[in-house]
């Protein structure tokens, strides 16, 4: 679209999105956002202050408008230039093929099931027997502690009975006096 044929009044009525669509249509190639903003400012005769005031809304409109596509690295193009299948290819970075390495022998590939069974069937493990004996001793000691508690309870009961007997004998002696 040739913007020279329009009067300045007609250009002021054009939106920034319409101008960008025309600019990209004329160029027929993707352009960076900054270049698009500079061309819009030149075509519409906008000052830097006016551009700074409108740039956020322009970027939002550019994203929302379905006619434009962001190709990455801040480059914009017309969606009509890219068939749907090609969009992913253009936008996504292409993976680099990886070099194949020689497989090194590490010795871990030879797994023998017999080795695993040997660990379960080990006889004569004296450490385990010692541990069981130690546990038995601990349990016996704890049982002994319970016996001590029972003895204490019995002692308390005996003391209480003796105290009652003492109190009774004391009362009898007082009555005799």
From Swiss-Prot:
Gene Ontology molecular-function annotations: DNA-directed RNA polymerase activity
Question: Keyword Ribonucleoprotein: yes or no?
Answer: no
Name one matching Pfam family.
HARE-HTH
Q: Which residues form the HTH HARE-type domain?
A: 14-81
Q: Where is the composition biased (Acidic residues)?
A: 106-177
User: One cellular component GO annotation, for this chain's record?
Assistant: DNA-directed RNA polymerase complex
The segment annotated Disordered runs over: 93-177
Q: Which residues form a coiled coil?
A: none
GO-annotated biological processes: DNA-templated transcription; regulation of DNA-templated transcription
Described purpose of this protein according to its UniProt entry: Participates in both the initiation and recycling phases of transcription. In the presence of the delta subunit, RNAP displays an increased specificity of transcription, a decreased affinity for nucleic acids, and an increased efficiency of RNA synthesis because of enhanced recycling.
Assembly with partners or alone = RNAP is composed of a core of 2 alpha, a beta and a beta' subunits. The core is associated with a delta subunit and one of several sigma factors.
- HAMAP family registered for this protein in UniProt: RNApol_bact_RpoE (MF_00357)
* The protein's name in its UniProt record: Probable DNA-directed RNA polymerase subunit delta
Protein source organism: Bacillus cereus (strain AH187)
Top-down, what is the taxonomic lineage of the species of origin? Answer: Bacteria, Bacillati, Bacillota, Bacilli, Bacillales
Q: Which gene encodes it?
A: rpoE
